[in-house]
Regions:
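Helix-loop-helix module between adjacent transmembrane segments
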Residues: 61-118, 140, 205-206, 236, ...
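Membrane-interfacial loop-to-helix junctions in multi-pass inner-membrane proteins
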Residues: 19-33, 59, 87-102, 117, ...
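Juxtamembrane/interfacial segments at transmembrane-helix boundaries in multi-pass membrane proteins
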Residues: 48-52, 159-217, 222, 244-263, ...
Length: 475
């Protein structure tokens, strides 16, 4: 079935690329969404059944794929280019949608990959397809962001490749057993600690470009800023999830080795530094898309603190990752409406949003509570669990600065968001303003509702999948 999914996705992408009819394009996008939903249902039913040796829908893969599919529906159906819609050529639109299809396909396959090299291959495919999306508007800013993204991602993925080679050295004479994740976990106690440490450092550093952590976070900021908002919605959620999957699968290997304590220390230091970096930039950022991008760094830092501290933090980290995906993607989609209204991404040029788009403004107000983990946001539950884990571990050296950083971030985020909602914009010409239809915000509300539901009323299946993801980790 995985081969059928991959081949069908490539056919859909190719058809979108060569087709010039708008109606057929819409039908092709709908057809791909039907394929994506069908395959998601298939892997949910066939959990842990390996296909063609290299793909296994385990609990983590299912959680990530379901999250991707839910978010892919509004992002693919969203009106992606408000301001330049009339200027877009049919070929440009086809290239955009074709790249989106390949991007979603690569994410799905990356989640499912059961071999460390196959994960690396599909992560590289996301880089290529994402670059097309970043380049979409073909102006000086998008060209610069595209080359920066390609350059930083290429270096980072070379790091991952070197890490894979070092991991093979750590296996010694057992290399012929293969590099499936299950095999590596089974062999972990006998892996050479020196080579395993080096392998982890390279793989962890390389995948931070996708996860959005220090040190390789920079390319992702520009990518989210310059890409069309639906693409940025995917970059800030499900693409970061793929980076997490790559790191987490390596983390599972080290969890069964003698270097596990050392790995947790590295993760905690990097995660706290990432939250610090996000805090610094959140205080001075003036661009709404960059503000949301730095907010993603903060949340990924919190996720990795949960992983590094262990205990209930494992469960909280997976929950935080999924809930963040829903709220952040919905926020980026709403930024499209903000840009449609104010013709700018600069916060000083926005204001009094309630006057121009009431449904969108109400959403932004609710999303503020959602993204800052203020009840009834489900992120309150995951962050509360992480704080409990830090208290139980007596990790005050992490807890105290983390709480300080989060307080500053809430203040900075609130200052900008309430300015957009209530303060009149500077030098804003109201003539010819394009109104948004309330129904266009419906998908944003549905994504926001999911974080309340999954946080406070999680279905048994959802909890079971998270528990299955972390069951082999030492509690």
């Amino acid at each position: 079935m995985i081969l059928l999914y991959l081949i069908s996705s490539i056919i859909f992408a190719s058809a979108l690329l060569i087709n010039r009819n708008a109606l057929i394009n819409k039908l092709l996008v709908l057809g791909f969404l039907v394929l994506q939903i069908s395959y998601t249902v298939f892997i949910f039913v066939h959990q842990n059944v390996t296909e063609v040796t290299y793909f296994t829908p385990d609990a983590l893969a299912i959680l990530m794929t379901v999250t991707l599919t839910i978010i892919a529906i509004p992002t693919l159906l969203h009106r992606y280019d408000y301001i330049y819609k009339e200027q877009d050529t049919p070929s440009n639109q086809g290239l955009y949608y074709g790249a989106m299809v390949i991007f979603v396909m690569a994410l799905t396959a990356g989640y499912l990959a059961s071999h460390i090299a196959v994960t690396w291959i599909f992560v590289e495919i996301t880089t290529l397809s994402a670059s097309v999306l970043i380049f979409h508007r073909r102006n000086a800013g998008s060209i610069e962001a595209t080359w920066k993204y390609i350059f930083v991602c290429s270096i980072s993925l070379v790091f991952v490749f070197i890490g894979i080679l070092l991991l093979s050295l750590a296996m010694g004479d057992q290399y012929e057993a293969g590099m499936q994740y299950d095999t590596l976990i089974r062999l972990a106690p006998s892996l050479n600690p020196f080579w395993l440490k080096l392998a982890f450092i390279f793989i962890f550093t390389g995948y931070t470009v996708k996860l959005g952590l220090v040190p390789m976070y920079t390319a992702g900021i520009d990518a989210k800023d310059k890409a069309p908002t639906p693409a940025a919605a995917l970059f800030s959620s499900v693409l970061m999830n793929l980076g997490f999957v790559g790191i987490f699968r390596m983390y599972l290997i080290t969890a069964h080795s003698s270097i596990f304590g050392w790995v947790n220390t590295i993760i905690l230091i990097t995660a706290l530094l990432s939250v610090f970096v996000a805090t610094v930039y959140m205080m001075k950022v003036k661009n709404i898309k960059r503000m949301l991008a730095y907010s993603s760094i903060e949340h990924m830092g919190i996720v990795m603190i949960g992983i590094g501290i262990g205990g209930i933090g494992y469960y909280a980290a997976i929950l935080q990752l999924i809930l963040h995906s829903f709220v952040k993607s919905s926020l980026f989609l709403q930024v499209g409406h903000l840009y449609k209204t104010f013709k700018s991404k600069e916060i000083f040029a926005m204001g009094n949003y309630f006057k121009y788009n009431t449904s969108g403004a109400v959403f932004l107000l609710l999303a503020f509570f959602g993204i800052t983990a203020i009840p009834p946001s489900g992120l309150f539950i995951s962050e509360f669990y992480i704080i409990i884990a830090l208290v139980k571990a007596h990790a005050l050296i992490i807890l105290i600065p983390l709480l300080l950083f989060l307080t500053i971030i809430i203040w900075a985020y609130g200052k900008n968001m309430f300015k957009i909602l209530f303060v009149p914009p500077m030098n804003f010409d109201q003539t010819g303003i394009e109104k948004s239809n309330p129904y266009e915000t419906l998908s944003h509300y549905l994504l926001l509702a999911l974080i309340v539901y999954l946080g406070f009323f999680p279905p048994t299946t959802f909890v079971t999948l998270i528990q299955a993801t972390i069951h082999s980790l030492p509690i």
